[in-house]
From Swiss-Prot:
Keywords: Cell wall, Glycoprotein, Repeat, Secreted, Signal. InterPro entries: LysM_dom, LysM_dom_sf. It comes from the Eukaryota. Expressed in penetration hyphae, infection vesicles and primary hyphae (intracellular hyphae). PANTHER family: LYSM DOMAIN-CONTAINING GPI-ANCHORED PROTEIN 2, MEMBRANE-BOUND LYTIC MUREIN TRANSGLYCOSYLASE D. The lineage of its organism: Eukaryota, Fungi, Dikarya, Ascomycota, Pezizomycotina. It comes from Colletotrichum lindemuthianum. This is Intracellular hyphae protein 1. Glycans are attached at N94, N161. Residues 30-87 are annotated as: 5 X 4 AA repeats of L-P-E-P. Residues 74-84 have a biased composition (Basic and acidic residues). Forms a multimeric structure.
Amino acid sequence: MQTSFVALLAVAASLASALPHGGNSYEASLPEPTNLPEPTKLPEPVEGPYKPKPPILPEPIKDNYKPKTPILPEHVEGPYKPKLPEPTTGDPKNNTLPVPTCVDGKIKTHKVKSGESLTTIAEKYDTGICNIAKLNNLADPNFVDLNQDLQIPTDACEKDNTSCIKPDGTATCVKDGKKDGKDIYSVVSGDTLTSIAQALQITLQSLKDANPGVVPEHLNVGQKLNVPVC
């Protein structure tokens, strides 16, 4: 019996030596304490009922307040004229606009037909009577021959209808009693009473008076007309 008790004491001693810290197994298994954060302080309670702050209102308008009158542009009488930009300074050559150029048309050949005159031919080719007369060296633009070939400067930039035309006559009769040795005029192709009167340097009315019954719009080639002489 004594031997069993001694054996138990020996086992207990061996177990105690195997444990840390003198055999206190409970203390060895606990973790070390950690630092906890301090609790936040709550705001102190407000004594009495809650009173919100009053809103900030704009200042009241004074009794003598007068709003500013807007400044309007002065009324301009008459039509509206927009302001144009002033011309730039510097070299005047840089301020000039390009001048459009005009180029005359080609020269075409035209054979004179019955009833045509330089006036009708010039209108057909958009040119001037004197442009045609000068190119063809015509002494009198009022006279062209039937089937005559004319060089026509078409689409003339500067149409000349006056420099080669004789002024209207002011006399009522042909002096010396004759015109080229005759007092009878024979109508040629392209003639009109006006062109004949200009060639004779007499008024159109005096030529009409000398040829009663003649229709100016229907002259025939070879028709004889009386020339008033004095």
